[in-house]
Amino acid sequence: NPDTIFTLPSLVNGYVAKAKTDADRAMLTAFEAELYASIYQDNMWRYNRVDAPLLPLPDDIAKWSAAQFAYKLNELYTEALRLAKADNKPLADYKNDVEYGKETLDYIPDIYSFILYRKVENLSEFNEKFYDRTKLQTACDEGAAMYAAGSPEAIYWQCTKIRRAPGYRHYDEYLDLYKANIGKPGAPYALAQAMNENYESFEPEANATADERNEQIAKRDSMIALPKQAIAKYPTFY
């Protein structure tokens, strides 16, 4: 039944008070936020067109506006982060409850940073009209500040801040971050982001001028050269 999803957030909310630890409550609250995010993303075109006062939130989630979803997500993530800060646990403790990639723990080792990551990812789906996106930049700064400069965790958050910044191409910013951290544990991640960014612009557009074409080719060549230089300089690091 498609309507079942609208009942799931309140169902999960009912388990929050029954949880035995703040860490469990934090993860359940974040899961509740995830459900609201999923509802919004499945039909965002519809919710984006709803014009309604921010508060009170309608009992019927199907009648919410995009701004109301953003408000609710921000509220839930704020509470989840408060709980996680009081009882931060390794994310690996929840390996049976949360799906994550093999390298995730290198960058997001604990539940606080995981919840912060999900906050940034889900609230980034809202445009500036519905959510102040400068708050995403602030959240990334918070994430980076939790870890040692140049560490994989700190570089991850700095790259996330770059990725969520206005604009579509951030190659130069990733490259500058990499160069500023050469020799530090997080440098490979920044380099990988620069490479991924440049892969997307390998081929000059059909209507590109000669100067634009040469600039794109030069960036491509610099991308190919960077890993070779890095491996040559730090052979045991990569």
Placement of each model-derived feature along the sequence:
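Extracytoplasmic/secretory-pathway proteins
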Residues: 1-238
